[in-house]
Amino acid sequence: MRECISVHVGQAGVQIGNACWELYCLEHGIQPDGQMPTDKTIGGGDDSFNTFFSETGAGKHVPRALFVDLEPTVVDEVRTGTYRQLFHPEQLITGKEDAANNYARGHYTIGKEIVDLVLDRIRKLADQCTGLQGFLIFHSFGGGTGSGFTSLLMERLSVDYGKKSKLEFAIYPAPQVSTAVVEPYNSILTTHTTLEHSDCAFMVDNEAIYDICRRNLDIEPPTYTNLNRLIGQIVSSITASLRFDGALNVDLTEFQTNLVPYPRIHFPLVTYAPVISAEKAYHEQLSVAEITNACFEPANQMVKCDPRHGKYMACCMLYRGDVVPKDVNAAIATIKTKRTIQFVDWCPTGFKVGINYQPPTVVPGGDLAKVQRAVCMLSNTTAIAEAWARLDHKFDLMYAKRAFVHWYVGEGMEEGEFSEAREDLAALEKDYEEVGMDSAEGEGEGAEEY
């Protein structure tokens, strides 16, 4: 088997974890107590969903997941919620005091006390796997636990499981909606620390998701539950190929092979379609061409940036539901002709396509409509550098005045780490700029002499 272990860190990670596992259970017909009436092979079996669930002898399906937070309230909701019987109590780890939106507390003082326990539990999960393929790590950039503890954990996972893939689902601080003033500090410190440890990071920007909920689902104002259910759909689309048998099965390494041209350029942009409410879906049937087109609308992206200003390096379309390759090829051909999609000149315009015949599932009573087909597009584009630029700018405004820095230094960080992290991100922006430059320019000048 090719198992994946999910690690949900901090409030954002845990709440997205709730949404994801709720959806996985519905998709696979697993009840909140872990029983699965449709599963014939009790206690083991080689079913595709075993990549995400382990089975006990009593026929109970347990998520291969770990929930970690430095303070107990959010994880307590899992302990008392609908799915409390699904998880083993040891999979839910909490500390006593939170990281107070402070990267240094999450990474150095408070995080340090709990990290060995977390690694021990991860080891137990890993021991139940026959062929662990990697980790999916869910966290936010802005929080103290999400930024500080995640980066500490990633460093340690690289030591213990050097060759295993590590994919991140990271919540990028929303440009307008902010939960903490120091989000830019935390984001830049965590990105700097995890850059070399993460193989691929899918960024989700809260504001982009807010806008999608407002515009497409008419929810006013959207709550975190609304946001997380939408994020859950996206994560489910990306992981569907690992959990179901599809026509094209993509494993974790295959994502990286197709999306990451250089180790540092590993932040694909995610777009999902269709996001429509039940009353709208009742009146329209969306064709493959329509949902494919929707993926190239900046309005459906999970991060605010404009790919029309950038260049694509790779593009991966993951369809699910009632979709046939013929329709997909036609839709993509149309897009290539009429859309202003620019690929970098060193990359042929290949679209990698995965099709999964399991139609998308929705949470009953949720906001999303049940649709026949959906698509999730992962594209590596230079436009995502705009997101880094925005963050760097905010960091600079605060750091120029050394605002709030004493809180970090007081927890044992050195001021040098700030400037080091900032330089690394400047280098990342530069990397994106260079990747998008035409490779032919250098050769052109020499050619005119002949």
Swiss-Prot record:
Undergoes a tyrosination/detyrosination cycle, the cyclic removal and re-addition of a C-terminal tyrosine residue by the enzymes tubulin tyrosine carboxypeptidase (TTCP) and tubulin tyrosine ligase (TTL), respectively. Acetylation of alpha chains at Lys-40 stabilizes microtubules and affects affinity and processivity of microtubule motors. This modification has a role in multiple cellular functions, ranging from cell motility, cell cycle progression or cell differentiation to intracellular trafficking and signaling. Its cofactor is Mg(2+). Pfam families: Tubulin, Tubulin_C. The active site is at residue 254. It catalyses: GTP + H2O = GDP + phosphate + H(+). Transmembrane segments: none annotated. The modification N6-acetyllysine is found at residue 40. One of its GO terms (biological process) is microtubule-based process. Keywords: Acetylation, Cytoplasm, Cytoskeleton, GTP-binding, Hydrolase, Magnesium, Metal-binding, Microtubule, Nucleotide-binding. Mg(2+) binds at residue 71. One of its GO terms (molecular function) is hydrolase activity. It is found in: Cytoplasm, Cytoskeleton. Its EC number is 3.6.5.-. It comes from the Eukaryota. The record marks 450 as: Involved in polymerization. One of its GO terms (cellular component) is microtubule. Dimer of alpha and beta chains. A typical microtubule is a hollow water-filled tube with an outer diameter of 25 nm and an inner diameter of 15 nM. Alpha-beta heterodimers associate head-to-tail to form protofilaments running lengthwise along the microtubule wall with the beta-tubulin subunit facing the microtubule plus end conferring a structural polarity. Microtubules usually have 13 protofilaments but different protofilament numbers can be found in some organisms and specialized cells. Belongs to the tubulin family. Tubulin is the major constituent of microtubules, a cylinder consisting of laterally associated linear protofilaments composed of alpha- and beta-tubulin heterodimers. Microtubules grow by the addition of GTP-tubulin dimers to the microtubule end, where a stabilizing cap forms. Below the cap, tubulin dimers are in GDP-bound state, owing to GTPase activity of alpha-tubulin. This is Tubulin alpha chain. It comes from Bombyx mori.
